[in-house]
Amino acid sequence: MSVEASKIECCPELLGNHAALLCLLPHQRSYLHRALALVGTGTRLVKASAAEVYAQSVCSRVAELDNGLGSLRLVQRFVGALANDSDPDPDIYRYHYENFVFRCIGLVDRAHLLVAAALLMSKKRGNMPDNHLIEGQVKNRNAGVHAALLEVKATVQLYRRPRNELVHASAYSCRDLGVLGGVLYLDLNAEGVDIEAVARALFSEGSNEIATTLEALTLKLGALLEAMHPMFELVAKAATKKAASKEAVE
């Protein structure tokens, strides 16, 4: 049976509940208990086993992905509400759509950092390795994970250029949004055209686009976790074996 088929029933939409992480959860819980005991003591270093540190590193990266997906759900909800607004505002739509574009590309970066954590890739001069370096490393070490990571990247690749334009050149726009914004800005006479209906239709299309992308990203990120499951199991089994050996000696 695949890992995907045995997802945890509680909040299945969260990547943190993916069955691929089950083998790491005891080690993460142990790490968190140790860290909790240090709260308020001024001590920052958590004395934990290698498996506990690994589990916390991986699971915290998964939590960052869940945070990003949660933000996309909020964006989709806001844009969906805007599509039903009595006074749809193109500027508000643009704001949310730009947020959507940034979040999509940000999730790709976070997926790469998850893979880096799973592969125990070290930081270089205090910074995490860049995406190209991570892809090169995982390609040589695990073809399945590499393919799954590229699938995540491909899902939102069409937003890479708009994201770069937002950062370096101009605000987001498309033909229909530009025309709509121009008509409203200049207060042109649009006799015979229901401007509000046109705006709502455009925003509804955007809401559907965001929902479709969100669903695809969630599935691809789940597939990435499943591809990494054997790596997680190796860590968990090694920790169990080490604990058993320690008990035998004692």
Segments and roles (model prediction):
Residues 65, 69-72, 100, 104, ...:
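Alpha-helical transition-metal enzyme core signature, strongest for iron centers
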Residues 23-28, 59-71, 116-127:
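Short low-complexity stretches enriched in small and charged residues
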Residues 84-124:
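Amphipathic alpha-helical interface elements
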Residues 2-59, 128-250:
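Acidic, Ser/Thr/Gly/Pro-rich intrinsically disordered interaction regions
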Residues 58-90:
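A glycine-rich, hydrophobic loop/mini-helix early in the fold
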Residues 49-52, 56-59, 63, 91, ...:
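Short coil/turn segments at secondary-structure boundaries
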Residues 75, 79-82, 114-117, 173:
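Transmembrane helix-loop junctions and nearby membrane-interface residues
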Residues 78, 100-102, 203, 232:
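Phenylalanine-focused residue identity feature
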